[in-house]
């Protein structure tokens, strides 16, 4: 009798594993990522989150591509292994409108933290600020994964920081950590200068093309990431890795991120932080396209380890019947650019 009971339990267990994609992913296109699932660095943490002790068994179970899409819309996400669990708490899709489904899916995707992919994560910088509504929180801090295989190495690290707005807490924190910091902001009324021994400021914009103007301001240059990297090679050396790339450029991220991907510059970036900005009430289809850009980063191999909403971007989302956020701070590390000697 005991053996029969154990057999039944195991049968149910394996049956549940086989239906995980259909049960949890009711509104997505789901396929494995371009790199092998069996070699994914995220697999052990994902298996642990699911209560599965054998990560190889999990890989074998979901190694085949699964496509399931009851929503006939233009918003079809092509998600990889790490993102297959983001919609597990979203239900009643059949009773929602297409716009509702899109908004809920996008919000869940951006809220997904995947924090288990980094054992030691720490925030650098940030100031305590309060809103007109009396909400008090930290703002300006950036998450950095300090796991030895991807952590910036003190006194041997390089940081590119785009978007300062006179708030230097992150840049100063990375300076204290021991990194060479290159700070950029075209909107500040400050010319190029050396802020201290390890930090240099440039009145320059990050763009998808090289121009000698920024928003019709002649004389303030706009440059691609690859052009900026080439400009700085005499200072930080050739073929070096950017240990941390911070991008906080008020919606211009949607212009520069595709160009960075296309240029191959992510091969030179170890960790990336982007503050994303969307407008759900204005154009949901555009938000969907923006979410696809984030997925392209992750399909390339950027491993998300932190995501938090900017509480000052909170809005009422009638489609979701709850508060939502239009700005998110997301951080990734690049598993392709790990410390090989760690």
For the regions a language model picked out, list residue spans one by one:
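Phosphate/nucleotide-binding beta-alpha loop and adjacent structural elements of enzyme active sites
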Residues: 2-342
């Amino acid at each position: 009798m005991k053996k029969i009971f154990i057999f039944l339990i195991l049968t149910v267990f394996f049956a549940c594993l086989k239906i995980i994609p259909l049960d949890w992913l009711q509104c997505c296109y789901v396929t494995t990522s371009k790199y092998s699932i069996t070699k994914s660095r995220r697999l052990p943490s994902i298996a642990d989150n699911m209560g599965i002790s054998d990560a190889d068994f999990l890989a074998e179970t979901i190694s085949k591509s699964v496509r399931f899409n009851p929503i006939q819309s233009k918003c079809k996400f092509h998600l990889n292994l790490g993102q297959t669990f983001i919609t597990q708490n979203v239900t009643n899709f059949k009773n929602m409108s297409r716009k509702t489904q899109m908004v809920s899916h996008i919000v869940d995707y951006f809220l997904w933290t995947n924090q288990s992919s980094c054992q030691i994560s720490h925030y650098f910088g940030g100031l305590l600020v309060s809103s007109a509504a009396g909400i008090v929180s930290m703002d300006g801090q950036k998450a950095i994964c300090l796991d030895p295989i991807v952590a910036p190495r003190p006194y041997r690290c390089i940081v590119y920081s785009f978007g300062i707005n006179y708030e230097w807490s992150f840049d100063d924190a990375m300076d204290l950590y021991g990194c060479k910091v290159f700070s950029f902001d075209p909107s500040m009324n400050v010319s190029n200068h050396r802020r201290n021994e390890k930090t240099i400021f440039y009145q320059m914009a990050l763009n998808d093309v090289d121009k000698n103007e920024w928003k019709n301001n002649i004389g303030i240059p706009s440059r691609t990431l690859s052009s900026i990297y080439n400009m700085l090679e005499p200072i930080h050396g050739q073929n070096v890795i950017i240990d941390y790339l911070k991008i906080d450029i008020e919606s211009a991220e949607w212009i520069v991120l595709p160009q960075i991907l296309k240029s191959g510059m992510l091969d030179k970036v170890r960790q990336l932080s982007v503050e994303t900005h969307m407008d759900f009430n204005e154009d949901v289809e555009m938000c969907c396209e923006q979410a696809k850009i984030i997925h392209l980063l992750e399909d390339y191999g950027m491993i998300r380890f932190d995501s938090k909403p900017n509480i000052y971007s909170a809005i009422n989302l009638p489609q979701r019947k709850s508060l939502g956020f239009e700005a998110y701070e997301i951080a990734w590390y690049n598993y392709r650019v790990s410390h090989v000697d760690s």
